[in-house]
């Protein structure tokens, strides 16, 4: 059996999807938002939190919908694709995917024929998880199974996960004195492939309006629907004519709720210059992660452990439900218009990712009045401390402009800069005595750096009531990939398990179209 066939055996044995737990690197998938919404919003780089008058602003600054004087319905869809990647031979994946991005309505409620307050509903895809990630590199005196062997001697002090348990079942031995120990193979090279897909869909319910001609307020309640899927495979070329393999299937489902409030005011009489301020509460998530891990070896003739070609693999899995409370988000935005032909916007946002609250469900509360049952939870202090060390405060800058050379034609451009989420020295710590580490079914992680986004857009007024908007977005992020955490023991390389970073990048393109109807 060759290494690739071993992988197919591992994947075939993983028929029931099961679960892992809350963990710093998994958390970040739920927090960061893509630049998505209507094509007009994306084409202007999303810098419309002060300009308003776009349905997508209800998910950041809810006061933005207060500028609508007519009912508007809009729907958005398009394509997303990656540059410079190929589907991995085992984990698979699609480079190009269709995406349904947005649908919503804003309607003014009128009293005596005059607009009084606006109400709105909008669905948008806040995260599109479609991504192929591949990495390969050299190993020296290190391997995934060696890290498990080092942890074996520290059981009771360090966390023990599904990968460790798999290797233990294959490599655990007993010496002449009857003492158990865990053997290992040093690695020479690795190859990793992952296909992530799914989305987070946000259903926003909005109310907004003008307190005066120069002051607007708004509030939004958001329901977040999490659908995350991942399939990853990991090969190691090992010493003694041996190859190693591990595979993971991961599924995250759940819901969350948040509240957004915001204001827009015009500080200068007679001037269209606007200032927007807004606060987004944490998203209070209830989540279920299901994961399955398989690990194994192929030993060829000549190995000192086998005189004939042979293979061994084992499967492990776990179930876990938990809660995550994401950080607060604060934003300030500036907007200005010149006549009816030029609009300029700038937005700054800040969110402290290190303040994520990972929570463990530790009981059930029964309400004696109505007989309902509710989960009770407490903070996972160990994982929260790791999150605080590993993640940083994230700054987002959004710039956008719209120019109308004709009343029926708009040209748009935008730019985003999102600072790095991870500390450059951060790592996925599999030794933590936390459910997030103990229930893990993989060891890899990537420290992604800052993200740059560039956008272009076109707007066409097809009639008095119909608009067609188009947008293109390119985003680029570099990162450092690690197949597992490093362990530094002492000057003896046999007591170390050190892996160097492999440079990776994520280049994504998106084209989208929005059809809007006003009445």
Feature names for model-found ranges:
Residues 7-10, 24-35, 88-93:
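Generic N-terminal amphipathic/basic segments
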Residues 14-15, 71, 405:
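Alpha-helical transmembrane segments and their juxtamembrane interfaces
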Residues 22-36, 106-519:
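Outer-membrane beta-barrel porins/channels
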Residues 39, 51-60, 65-139, 198-201:
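Outer-membrane beta-barrel translocator/receptor signature
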């Amino acid at each position: 059996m060759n290494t690739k066939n071993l992988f197919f055996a591992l994947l075939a044995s993983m028929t029931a999807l099961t679960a892992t737990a809350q963990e710093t690197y998994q958390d970040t998938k739920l927090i960061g938002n893509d630049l998505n919404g209507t094509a007009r919003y994306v084409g202007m780089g999303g810098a419309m939190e002060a300009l308003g008058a776009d349905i997508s602003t209800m998910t950041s600054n809810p006061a933005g919908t207060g500028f609508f004087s007519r009912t508007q319905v809009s729907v958005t869809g398009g394509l997303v694709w990656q540059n410079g990647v190929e589907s991995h031979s085992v984990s698979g994946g699609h480079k190009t995917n269709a995406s349904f991005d947005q649908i919503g309505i804003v309607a003014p409620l009128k009293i005596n024929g005059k607009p009084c307050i606006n109400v709105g509903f909008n669905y948008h895809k806040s995260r599109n998880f479609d991504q192929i990630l591949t990495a390969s590199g050299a190993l020296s005196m290190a391997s995934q199974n060696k890290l498990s062997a080092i942890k074996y001697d520290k059981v009771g002090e360090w966390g023990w996960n599904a990968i460790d348990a798999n290797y233990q079942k294959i490599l655990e031995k007993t010496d002449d004195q009857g003492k158990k120990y865990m053997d290992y193979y040093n690695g020479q090279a690795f190859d990793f492939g992952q296909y992530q897909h799914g989305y987070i869909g946000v259903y926003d319910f909005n109310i907004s309006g003008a307190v005066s001609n120069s002051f607007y307020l708004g509030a939004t309640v958001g329901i977040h629907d999490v659908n995350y899927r991942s399939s990853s495979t990991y090969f190691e070329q090992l010493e003694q004519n041996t190859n190693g393999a591990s595979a993971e299937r991961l599924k995250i489902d759940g819901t969350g709720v948040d509240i957004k409030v915001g204001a827009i005011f015009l500080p200068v009489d007679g001037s269209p210059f606007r200032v927007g301020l807004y606060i987004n509460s944490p998203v209070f998530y209830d989540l279920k992660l299901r994961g399955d891990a398989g690990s194994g070896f192929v030993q060829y003739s000549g190995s000192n452990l086998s005189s004939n070609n042979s293979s061994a693999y084992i499967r492990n899995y776990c179930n876990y439900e938990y809660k995550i409370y994401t950080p607060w988000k604060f934003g300030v935005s500036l907007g200005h218009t010149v006549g009816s032909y030029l609009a300029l916007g700038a937005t700054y946002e800040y969110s402290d990712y290190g303040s994520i609250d990972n929570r463990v469900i530790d009981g059930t509360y029964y309400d004696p009045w109505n007989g309902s049952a509710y989960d009770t939870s407490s903070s996972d202090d160990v994982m929260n401390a790791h999150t605080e060390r590993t993640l940083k405060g994230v700054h987002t800058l959004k710039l956008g402009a719209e120019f109308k050379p004709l009343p029926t034609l708009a040209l748009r451009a935008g730019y985003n800069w999102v600072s790095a989420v991870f500390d450059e020295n951060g790592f996925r710590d599999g030794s933590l005595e936390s459910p997030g580490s103990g229930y893990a079914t993989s060891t890899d992680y990537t420290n992604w750096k800052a993200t740059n986004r560039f956008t272009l857009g076109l707007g066409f007024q097809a009639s008095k009531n119909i608009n067609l908007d188009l947008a293109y977005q390119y985003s680029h992020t570099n990162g450092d990939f690690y197949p597992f955490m490093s362990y530094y023991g002492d000057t003896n390389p046999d007591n170390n398990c050190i892996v160097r970073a492999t440079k990776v990048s994520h280049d994504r393109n998106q084209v989208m179209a929005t059809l809007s109807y006003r009445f």
